[in-house]
Amino acid sequence: MLLLLLSCNDKQAKVTTPNVLLSESQMVEIMTDVYILENAINYRRGKSISVNNLKTKGYEALFNHYGITDSIFFDNMDYYNENPLLMKNVMDSVCARFQKMK
């Protein structure tokens, strides 16, 4: 029983807050643009057009636009994925934004 309690405690201790924590609204903005970029990449891939340059340049432009690095983005993705309720809020907001775009 004690082992079970300790293992549960360890899981919660692994959730670390990034040095630069992006707000939910910032994550919604960024994730919306990530989905648009990924769809552009997948479209080109479907047309058998090289996507390496688009992917590299696209993410570089996206991170520059938001004033973040890839490390900040991925640290925040880890943080939000480790907090399912926060990530659900972000993704629900992203979906709502796309619904408004239709």
Question: What name fits each language-model region?
Answer:
Residues 14-15, 61:
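Preference for short coil/turn "hinge" residues that link or interrupt alpha-helices
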Residues 16-37:
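Post-signal peptide N-terminal segment of mature Sec-exported envelope proteins
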Residues 42-102:
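Compact alpha-helical subdomains of small soluble proteins
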Residues 4-7:
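C-terminal motif of bacterial Sec signal peptides marking the signal peptidase cleavage site
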Residues 9-12:
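Bacterial signal peptide processing site
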